[in-house]
Design a protein with these regions (language model features):
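Membrane-proximal helix-turn-helix segments that form the acceptor-binding/catalytic region
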Residues: 124, 128-132, 157-178
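N-terminal subdomain of nucleotide-sugar transferases
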Residues: 1-68, 246-248, 384, 399
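Nucleotide-sugar-dependent
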Residues: 234, 284-291, 296-319, 326-336
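A charged, aromatic-enriched C-terminal amphipathic alpha-helix characteristic of glycosyltransferases
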Residues: 348, 364-395
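Conserved donor-binding/catalytic core segment of Leloir-type glycosyltransferases
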Residues: 215-247, 256
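Nucleotide-activated donor-binding/catalytic signature segment of Leloir-type glycosyltransferases, i.e.
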Residues: 221, 250, 265-289
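Carbohydrate-associated surface elements
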Residues: 41, 182, 201
Length: 399
């Protein structure tokens, strides 16, 4: 079977979508399918890190070459407009990927099935191309973009337009993969017909990442790391406020943001002049692992109200490296962190986050330990299990 993945982000980029779709490609190839990936050219900082760690190896990993009977993954990258942080974000950037994508999907060998992922404009391009070629497609619904836009305070007309595009993409899909029950519920409300829930998983390496990442602080105190997307609906600026409040009790501490996103400039403005806060542009997934592995604790957040069903994948990535998490937000992620002693869960409150930083830095917080955290991810959020389940959904689109 020939499967085409249409995605603006793919491994070795350090995004949840890139890691999720890389795992799906490996699972499909391991089952004997041929996978063709239409994606974007890497951001310069990610490409540099990938060259240093060996991008050829990263792509070999993505090929899923597991021996006899394995398929092949072919990754085709095309130029795309990125913002100043290196992200493909905003509708000008989206169009720079989606319009050429339509032509790419209409050319070449006819696939048996196409897999699309957000944003909705990509889903629209996929639906149009698949209708013309009479090919079924699967929509991998990791989030509801219109809900995130509403939470970010985007004007109502824009939110309604995005919701219309999202509904169009979902209604045309033969099957939809949702990463949580909450996402599945909203997908059905927007018109999805056949939805399967496959929770996100992450790979737990045999050993935690080693080596010192470029730019890692040489300080005597704790280092808190926020690695991943920076956006208004995630409210990452609250960690700057909390760090500033707890600074005197943390000694020679550092707070480091490693990533990109629509909220990057605003975060930089908020952090300007705050001692001990650094911002590092997006790095490769391997380099992000090294940042998380060496951190005292990693940080994740979610603004409550309308998007509470989201589960930040950066939590799982941190635990896979044996590092505790401070999660400020609602939902299942908070329950997991609290009930399984995976760090500290609190509300999106400056004082509570400040206390969590002090508790983890001093060893006062309940913590299952490095081995315990990694074991929890293996048992509950294995990427091997999730990618196999997602691959089964993709194959079922032909049934």
């Amino acid at each position: 079977m020939l499967v085409t993945l249409a995605t603006r982000t793919f491994t070795p980029e350090p995004t949840a979508a890139a890691l999720r779709l890389g795992a799906l490609a490996r699972a499909l190839a391991a089952g004997g399918d041929t996978v063709r990936v239409f994606t974007s050219r890497l951001a310069s900082s990610v490409a540099r890190d990938a060259r240093e760690t060996g991008e050829s190896q990263a792509l070999a990993d993505a090929s899923g070459d597991t021996g006899e009977g394995s398929g092949l993954v072919e990754v085709r990258r095309a130029p795309v407009l990125r913002d100043r942080t290196g992200a493909v974000r905003g509708y000008v950037s989206y169009m720079s990927f989606d319009l050429p994508l339509l032509a790419r999907l209409l050319g070449g060998p006819r696939p048996d099935v196409v897999v699309s992922e957000p944003p909705p404009t990509t889903g629209v391009a996929v639906r149009l191309a698949c209708a013309l070629r009479r090919v079924p497609y699967v929509y991998y619904c990791a989030d509801i973009v219109s809900d995130a836009a509403a939470l970010a305070g985007v004007p109502g007309l824009v939110v309604r337009t995005v919701a219309g595009l999202e509904s169009f993409a979902l209604r045309g899909a033969r099957r939809v993969i949702a990463v949580s029950d909450g996402v599945a519920r909203r997908a059905r409300e927007l018109g999805a017909r056949d939805v399967a829930v496959v929770p996100n998983g992450v790979r737990v390496p045999e050993a935690v990442a080693t080596g010192v990442p470029d730019g890692f602080p040489t300080c005597s105190g704790p280092v808190f790391v926020y690695a991943g997307t920076v956006a208004q609906w995630l409210a990452p600026e609250v960690f700057v406020d909390a760090f500033e409040r707890a600074r005197e009790r943390l000694g020679d501490a550092r707070l480091v943001f490693v990533g990109q996103g629509s909220g990057w400039d605003g975060l930089a403005a908020r952090a300007r002049g705050v001692t001990g806060v650094d911002l590092i542009p997006a790095v490769s997934a391997d380099e992000a692992d090294r940042w998380m592995a060496r951190a005292t604790a990693t940080l994740a957040s979610l603004r409550p109200g309308g998007y509470d069903y989201a589960y930040p994948t950066k939590i799982l990535a941190s635990l896979a490296q044996g590092t505790p998490v401070i999660y400020a937000g609602p939902g299942q992620a908070a329950r997991d962190v609290e009930e399984s002693a995976l760090g500290v869960a609190c509300s999106l409150d400056v004082d509570e986050i400040a206390e969590a930083m002090v508790a983890l830095a001093s060893g006062a917080a309940s913590w299952v330990g490095r081995d315990g955290a990694r074991a929890w991810v293996r048992e509950h959020r294995s990427v091997l299990a999730s990618s196999r389940a997602a691959a089964a959904v993709v194959r079922s689109a032909l049934a």
